[in-house]
Regions:
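N-terminal type II signal-anchor transmembrane helix
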Residues: 2-36
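Extended surface/linker regions that mediate inter-domain or inter-protein docking
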Residues: 13, 17-23, 130-201, 297-304
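Electrostatic cytochrome c docking/interface patches
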Residues: 31-57, 174-205
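Gly/Gly-Pro-rich "capping" loops immediately C-terminal to redox-active cysteine motifs
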Residues: 44, 68-105, 124-133, 159-171, ...
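The canonical Cys-X-X-Cys-His
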Residues: 53, 58-68, 140, 200-203, ...
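C-terminal capping alpha-helices of c-type cytochrome domains
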Residues: 104-117, 129-154, 264-280, 288-317
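Extended amphipathic alpha-helical interaction segments
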Residues: 187-192, 212, 218-222
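Long compositionally biased, domain-poor regions of proteins
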Residues: 206, 233-234, 270-273
Length: 321
């Protein structure tokens, strides 16, 4: 009996030492870095491509990165009470040291594909576009390099995200739960606009990332395979504005009771471009007014959403609590 207890005690002591060693490794060793493999990028110079890049940057990127100086200098994105703590978005102006001025076009493309910055550290995947066409990604980078006022250099600097000092986040990163997105460097093309449903899927899940807000949570979205995101297009995601007021994203699956299954295509177009619901009320301001979208784009998104499995999730019930 004494021998068994002794063996058990030794085993327990070894286990405790292993746990202490693992905790010390998580807490005190450097964060992992990854090899940066910038692809070759040919930036477009035509006005149509710049306009396309402007759409994404000003409709999507600006929501998080537009600072108080009117430039893409970053802003406070989450408060200390947030599960991941206080976090500021990055300065992505053309400043040579405080923005993205040091990045090559290839390094920017690799960052947008994988979430790995030029120093080999993971900073994504919130802003990643792993399935965007090479042509469209180049249009975004071309606009980031343009003479647009919002992209001009800003001196703004921000504190490092609080989550970087979190033991839990460090553990998730070091054990590979949080990791960069894969990228094999193979060419990626967008579907043609003539294939309306495929084109609509591309716009809704990649180019404009509608699913990002309209699925269950930013934290559980799956950028590589958007359809596997929990609550895909069924809403329920608390979306904050610049003053941290939140509204719950709506179910936009074809559910007739809780989604947009009873809407017409024209009503959907009015909601997306003008922010007007079928009953005449206005959408909350967290939902951007996509007035610059072509009708063809909105109709393609509508056609694709009709193919999404209906969900009976009722986000309004969550909001009412």
């Amino acid at each position: 009996m004494k021998k068994a207890l002794k063996i058990a005690g030794i085993g327990f002591g070894i286990l405790v030492l292993l746990l202490i060693a693992t905790a010390a490794w998580v807490q005190f060793t450097p964060m992992p870095t990854y090899e940066v493999k910038p692809p070759t990028v040919q930036l477009p110079v035509d006005s149509a491509s710049l306009a396309k890049g402007r759409k994404v940057v000003e409709l999507a990127c600006a929501h998080c990165h537009l600072g108080e100086d009117g430039k893409m200098s970053g802003r406070l994105f989450s408060q200390a009470t947030d599960p991941f703590g206080e976090m500021w978005t990055a300065n992505i102006t053309q400043h040579p040291t405080k923005g993205i001025g040091r990045y090559t076009d290839g390094e920017l493309a690799y960052l947008l594909r994988t979430g790995i910055n030029r120093d080999g550290r993971v900073v994504g995947p919130m802003m990643c576009h792993p399935n965007m066409s090479d042509e469209d990604l180049a249009s975004i980078i071309a606009y980031l390099r343009s003479d647009s006022g919002i992209m001009q250099p800003s001196e703004a600097t921000h504190p490092a995200p609080a989550y970087l000092s979190s033991f839990m986040v460090k553990a998730l990163i070091k054990f590979g739960v949080f990791k960069p997105l894969p990228y094999d460097g193979k060419p990626i093309s967008a579907p043609p606009a003539t294939d309306q449903i495929a084109y609509g899927r591309y716009l809704a899940t990649e180019f404009y990332e509608c699913y990002g807000c309209h699925s269950a949570s930013f934290e559980t979205n799956n950028p590589m395979e958007p359809e596997k995101s929990p609550g895909f297009f069924a809403g329920g995601n608390p979306v904050p504005d610049e003053e941290f007021n939140t509204c719950i994203s709506r179910n936009i699956t074809p559910s007739k009771e809780h989604g947009i299954g009873s809407w017409t295509e024209e009503q959907f177009l009015s909601a997306v471009k003008g922010g007007i619901r079928p009953d005449g009320s206005m959408l909350q301001h967290q939902m951007p007014r996509f007035a610059v979208l072509d009708d063809e784009e909105v109709r393609a998104i509508w056609a694709y959403l009709q193919t999404v499995p209906p969900s009976e999730n009722n986000p309004l019930r969550v909001e009412a609590k």
